[in-house]
């Protein structure tokens, strides 16, 4: 098993050798696919949609790898692409199904309940339903902080929001989830 070294991989991506570039990107795919899939899946819920969006994310990353400046970590850049792809997908889905923002919670909860790949118990289902009632930004912040254990600084880079605003968003999300779990 080869160890993942981001500095070496970035050097290989910048090389003139297409085989070296391809090998480096294959390592990126191998290292980040599962993490990106989980982030996307938390946003779109559907296994099939998450797989499609993961592929779109990786294709977009490959096609634009020369635009990666190295200001942030590669993972941050990939997460940003994945989040943007997911938000675009959700907005298109909402428009295609003629779903208002207010009705979106019900739509997503119905989707979660009918998901054949969901293997959690009743408490996990209740937690997921609570998360689905959050506004999109709070949902993103909560998932990245709680499930992915990302530092606020990295979330800030991905979402383009200040650390203070993210902390407030996470706090509000946690309170809303707590209220949902205690009253439902």
Tell where the protein language model's regions lie, with residue ranges.
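N-terminal module of bacterial RNA polymerase sigma factors
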Residues: 1-34, 183
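Internal acidic/polar
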Residues: 2-9, 96-120
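Short, charged helix-capping/linker segments at alpha-helix termini
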Residues: 18-27, 37-56, 163, 183-184
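Sigma70-family region 2
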Residues: 45, 58-73
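Structural recognition of an alpha-helix C-terminal capping motif at a helix-to-coil junction
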Residues: 52-59, 72-84
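Arg/Lys-rich amphipathic alpha helix in sigma70-family domain 2
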Residues: 67-69, 80-101, 172
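DNA-recognition helix of helix-turn-helix
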Residues: 87, 138, 153, 157-183
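A short pre-motif secondary-structure segment
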Residues: 141-145
């Amino acid at each position: 098993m080869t160890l993942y070294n981001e500095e070496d991989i970035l050097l290989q991506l910048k090389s003139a050798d297409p085989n070296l570039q391809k090998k480096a990107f294959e390592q990126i795919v191998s290292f980040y696919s599962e993490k990106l899939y989980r982030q996307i899946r938390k946003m779109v819920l559907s296994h099939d949609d998450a797989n499609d969006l993961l592929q779109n994310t990786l294709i977009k990353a490959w096609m634009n790898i020369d635009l990666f400046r190295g200001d942030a970590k590669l993972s941050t850049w990939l997460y940003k692409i994945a989040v943007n792809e997911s938000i675009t997908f959700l907005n298109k889905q909402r428009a295609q199904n003629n779903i208002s923002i207010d009705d979106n919670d019900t739509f997503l909860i119905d989707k979660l309940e009918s998901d054949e790949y969901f293997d959690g118990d009743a408490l996990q289902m209740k937690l997921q339903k609570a998360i689905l009632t959050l506004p999109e930004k709070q949902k993103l912040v909560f998932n990245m902080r709680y499930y992915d254990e990302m530092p606020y600084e990295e979330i800030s880079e991905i979402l383009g929001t200040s650390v203070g605003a993210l902390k407030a968003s996470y706090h509000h999300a946690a309170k809303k989830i707590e209220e949902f779990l205690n009253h439902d």
